[in-house]
């Protein structure tokens, strides 16, 4: 499986009762089927996976797979601070029909670089699915260094990509330079997609694509084609929206945006809170300026 282009990090809609809004989730998935989106990431950070019960996780993943109807690959977000539990999640996601796994680095317990290597090796050996390593030190408190990632990729044939959200172009450049042909680097920061693709990344796992899928996909397509003049133009056009969608902790703003657009409602689950009134005004103005309301 080749990873390239724009993958959307799907939000998880909640209804007024606080449960999963299944109809809204189906609408959200359908909005991507012909928008140029390369694939769907379910139950990741943007999908509030940390707040889902086990049954909710299964239901969100199963609904996403069913509604995509085989038209787009579905990547299941998995990952805990325990390797054995993460292996269980990998097996479960595979049994539900996921096409690939986005595996979060262990959080809270701050493993060493060798511990990270052993963790990802154990997960990859217990699934036949392609694995995307998810490096997001701002949330996990541990950075997967380039040498560690390259060691993982070299020793684990089904580790096919990394979602790199360290914010470091130096780190991305080291990975691109050292990785085998076919290994993909995907941006984990919407604001850095074009800069990362300029040094060899293959695409993005995008929050912004929830609300502007066609534009985000077009930006990635231009960069992949080597048309960085067009990619920069699209980046500049999207950048104010990107800033607005990260004015508070993700996914608070994107869930508010989806509600304003009528795609789905429901505030995030505690401990995240609804977008503040001042920031709702800022976000609404930005969406209106782009013709999204």
Set out the residue ranges of the language-model regions.
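Catalytic alpha/beta core domains of metabolic enzymes, predominantly
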Residues: 125, 139-246
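Alpha-helix N-capping/helix-start residues
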Residues: 16, 22, 54, 146, ...
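Short, amphipathic alpha-helical "lid/cap" segments that border enzyme active or binding sites
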Residues: 22, 26-29, 146, 280, ...
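A general structural signal for well-ordered alpha-helical segments in protein cores
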Residues: 25, 57, 61, 86, ...
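C-terminal alpha-helical cap/extension of soluble enzyme domains
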Residues: 2, 7-13, 35-37, 198-201, ...
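Active-site beta->alpha loop and helix N-cap motifs at the rims of alpha/beta catalytic domains
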Residues: 1-8, 12-141, 151
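Short helix-capping segments at alpha-helix termini
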Residues: 66-72, 96-97, 127-129, 154-158, ...
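Glycine-rich phosphate-binding "P-loop"
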Residues: 135-136, 158, 269-270
């Amino acid at each position: 499986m080749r990873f390239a282009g724009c993958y959307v990090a799907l939000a998880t809609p909640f209804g007024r009762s606080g449960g999963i809004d299944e109809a809204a989730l189906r609408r959200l998935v359908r909005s991507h089927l012909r928008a140029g989106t390369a694939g769907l990431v379910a139950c990741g950070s943007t999908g509030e996976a940390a707040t889902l019960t086990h049954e909710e996780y299964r239901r969100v993943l199963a609904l996403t797979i069913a509604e995509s109807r085989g038209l787009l690959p579905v990547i299941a977000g998995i990952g805990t601070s325990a390797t054995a539990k993460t292996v269980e999640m990998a097996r479960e996601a595979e049994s539900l029909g996921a096409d690939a796994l986005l595996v979060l680095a262990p959080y809270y317990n701050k493993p060493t670089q060798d511990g990270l290597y052993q963790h990802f090796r154990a997960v990859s050996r217990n699934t036949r699915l392609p694995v995307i390593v998810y490096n997001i030190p701002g949330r996990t408190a541990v950075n997967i260094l380039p040498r560690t990632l390259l060691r993982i990729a070299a020793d684990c044939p089904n580790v096919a990509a990394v979602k790199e959200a360290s914010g470091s172009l130096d780190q991305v450049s080291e990975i691109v330079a050292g990785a085998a042909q076919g290994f993909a680097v995907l941006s984990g920061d919407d604001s850095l997609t074009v800069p990362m693709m300029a040094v060899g990344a293959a695409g993005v796992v995008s929050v912004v694509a929830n609300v502007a899928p066609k534009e985000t996909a077009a930006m990635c397509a231009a960069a992949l084609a080597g048309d960085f003049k067009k990619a920069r133009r699209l980046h500049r056009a999207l950048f104010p929206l990107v800033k607005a969608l990260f004015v508070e902790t993700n996914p608070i703003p994107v869930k508010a945006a989806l509600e304003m657009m009528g795609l789905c409602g429901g505030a995030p689950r505690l401990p995240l809170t609804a977008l503040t009134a001042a920031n709702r005004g800022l976000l609404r103005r930005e969406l209106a300026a782009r013709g999204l309301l």
